[in-house]
């Protein structure tokens, strides 16, 4: 992870997101210490946070700019991971209870209480939260269900305000996930992105790239990514994932 993160920073990355190991959201405790293995990702532990923060500070000195670090406080240990991130200097945290409710069958009352407490911590620590609206579009049609993304953004904004987060700390999520074969699809994507920016003018919006309709056609994939990048710049998205 350290080697890849430093390489990405040298290629121009501003934020490094370290993917969590599969299933950590269902652990009712936080693992301790540095870990040497994971499944599709790396365990979120305080020591792992410290190691990556030190690595990014090292490459940041070399490049003359600060590299932000992102991890995940979702699942059954949202406040615990939030406080670890605050201690170790993380800048961005995925922090959304609705994903756990919809996709992990986590108890709704418990996880919304956890989300509130973890957002208080993130707000106090100056951490930008990201929300997971893009996940809805992996199982729902991005054109037919576009309104659900906006509804979730509005809910997440109000829950964030209740926890004391500033607008600039709200990385409200949406995604470039419409079917490329949809007539006028690019215009719909552009309209959706501009609308989201206008409704949340001060938020650090999180804009996710196309994944659902990526095929083995490499050329078409590059075109989809280029159109995503064009809309992201055009509509002034805040955090654009690659």
Q: What are the language-model segments listed below?
A:
Residues 1-242:
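Anaerobic metallocofactor- and corrinoid-dependent redox/one-carbon enzyme cores
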């Amino acid at each position: 992870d350290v080697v890849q993160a430093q390489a990405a920073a040298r290629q121009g990355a501003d934020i490094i997101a370290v993917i969590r190991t599969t299933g950590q959201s269902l652990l009712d405790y936080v693992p301790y210490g540095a870990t040497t293995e994971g499944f599709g990702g790396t365990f979120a532990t305080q020591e792992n946070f410290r190691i990556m923060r030190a690595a990014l500070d090292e490459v940041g000195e070399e490049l003359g700019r600060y590299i932000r670090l992102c991890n995940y406080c979702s699942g059954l240990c949202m406040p615990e991971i939030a406080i670890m991130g605050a201690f170790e200097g993380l800048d961005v945290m995925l922090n959304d209870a609705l994903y756990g409710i919809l996709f992990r069958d986590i108890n709704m009352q418990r996880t919304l209480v956890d989300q509130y407490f973890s957002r208080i911590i993130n707000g106090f620590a100056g951490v930008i939260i990201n929300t997971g609206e893009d996940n809805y579009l992996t199982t729902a049609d991005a054109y037919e269900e576009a309104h659900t993304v906006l509804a979730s953004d509005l809910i997440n904004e109000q829950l964030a305000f209740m926890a004391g987060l500033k607008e600039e700390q709200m990385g409200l999520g949406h995604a470039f996930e419409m079917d490329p074969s949809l007539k006028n699809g690019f215009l719909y994507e552009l309209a959706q992105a501009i609308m989201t920016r206008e409704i949340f003018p001060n938020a650090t919006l999180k804009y996710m790239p196309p994944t659902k309709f990526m095929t083995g056609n490499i050329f078409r994939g590059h075109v989809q990514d280029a159109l995503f990048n064009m809309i992201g710049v055009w509509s002034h998205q805040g955090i654009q994932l690659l």
